[in-house]
UniProtKB/Swiss-Prot annotation:
Keywords: Acetylation, Hydrolase, Nucleus, Phosphoprotein, Protein phosphatase
Function: Regulates mitogenic signal transduction by dephosphorylating both Thr and Tyr residues on MAP kinases ERK1 and ERK2.
Residue positions where Phosphoserine is found in the record: S387, S392
Induction entry: By mitogens and by stress.
Taxonomic placement: Eukaryota, Metazoa, Chordata, Craniata, Vertebrata
Subunit organization: Hollow spherical complex composed of 24 subunits with pseudooctahedral symmetry, has a tetramer as the basic unit.
N-acetylvaline modifications at: V2
Tissue/organ expression: Expressed at moderate levels in nearly all tissues and cells including brain, spleen, and testes with the higher expression in the heart and lung and lower expression in skeletal muscle and kidney. Undetectable in liver. Expressed in many areas of the brain with very strong expression in the hippocampus, piriform cortex, and the suprachiasmatic nucleus.
SMART domains: DSPc, PTPc_motif, RHOD
Protein name per the record: Dual specificity protein phosphatase 4
Amino acid sequence: MVTMEELREMDCSVLKRLMNRDENGGTAGSSGGSHGALGLLSGGKCLLLDCRPFLAHSAGYIRGSVNVRCNTIVRRRAKGSVSLEQILPAEEEVRARLRSGLYSAVIVYDERSPRAESLREDSTVSLVVQALRRNAERTDICLLKGGYERFSSEYPEFCSKTKALAAIPPPVPPSTNESLDLGCSSCGTPLHDQGGPVEILPFLYLGSAYHAARRDMLDALGITALLNVSSDCPNHFEGHYQYKCIPVEDNHKADISSWFMEAIEYIDAVKDCRGRVLVHCQAGISRSATICLAYLMMKKRVRLEEAFEFVKQRRSIISPNFSFMGQLLQFESQVLTTSCAAEAASPSGPLRERGKATPTPTSQFVFSFPVSVGVHAAPSNLPYLHSPITTSPSC
């Protein structure tokens, strides 16, 4: 077996030349994910793997790279040996190409990537390299010297970073002959309606009913579809955008988890059509945030704590009610402990079927905490609930 000391190293300048050659040839991917990786570097002959945590990758990454999944749960289950299904759960095509020897080289990087001989045996890079050597024996594996930190410093034009949203025009005061019914009785602009929808992923946005009623905001962001997670927020522009409604109340009796897979499939359908979807409820704090968290957990294979921190960095006021947090924790267990073989065979298969909606929840996912959040409560009146994730009133 080849040791870490024998792992080849690649200078940042070499990777830059490869990417520059691809750009000149028109084959480089312009975004992260498997589709970018399949077109990256010499017509898809090389694969770039980002071994950093999900939050770090989401904040900034080398264009075309694929983020591997190697969180604490994966490590604990792996007991020192991870599989391709564990580190690349949603990248079926990438796994197939690796096993078929269709990549001439795989380039791995982390935040700073010390020299190969100094890599710890239990580091993510080491575990990934070992998995590659077992499953892609004919493929050269290289370590990017200096990692993302050095490459992004020297060649920022080849990196993608989370962008601040473009300024959204302020609301236009309604005239005496024209007004817009936003479905709420509050005056002025409450906290949850200030600013615009926030980008969770390039195709996924989170906001409030007010944002969903602002066609100028939606058009400015390129929104093509809306996911309305409420039973009473109107769909204002049904002739202009695609709509889907999930009629869930924001209280401790609501079974929102029974809608997770349907919501995830809808978001994916919009993504596959190269569209963008806004997920909203009344305030964009509890119900719609819960759906976005479930999507990240399922598609990115991350823990609730990681997903929550990721979304909170973008919309600081999110606060799913206690019952929703309990359902998300149960969903986390379902997502992260499902056998890798089952994930590989059916990565988008439903974890549970959604039954007919009934006033009385029958789901085992519902945790009936004696707490509820008013559907139309203003931020100042919201009981910001404390949980293992929401630990401060500011969340």
